[in-house]
């Protein structure tokens, strides 16, 4: 990833913490979205919106369905940024 992609990923983490009222230290790569962070299906829709805000692209529904952890989300954000 280049510096711009790193900045966007950091911006994504900040948005994630703010939007879902999470402590930044809770956004560990292994943190499970539903079980550990207590996100629900409405939050999942908001998460897709945050991903689009950061990358300018919609996440593929199939890929989004497989996202379970913060690390999974970050990998998808990186993939979308690389493929800009």
Predicted segments, located by residue:
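Generic structural marker for isolated residues within well-ordered, non-membrane alpha-helices
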Residues: 13, 30, 48
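Residues in well-ordered alpha-helical elements
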Residues: 25, 45, 70-71
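Phosphopantetheinylated carrier protein domains
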Residues: 44-66
């Amino acid at each position: 990833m280049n510096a711009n992609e790193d900045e966007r990923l950091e911006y994504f983490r900040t948005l994630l913490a703010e939007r879902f009222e999470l402590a930044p230290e809770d956004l560990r790569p292994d943190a499970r979205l539903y079980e550990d962070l207590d996100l629900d299906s409405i939050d999942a829709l908001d998460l897709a919106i945050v991903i689009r805000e950061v990358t300018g692209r919609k996440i593929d529904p199939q890929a989004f369905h497989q996202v379970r952890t913060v690390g999974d989300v970050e990998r998808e954000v990186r993939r979308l940024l690389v493929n800009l």
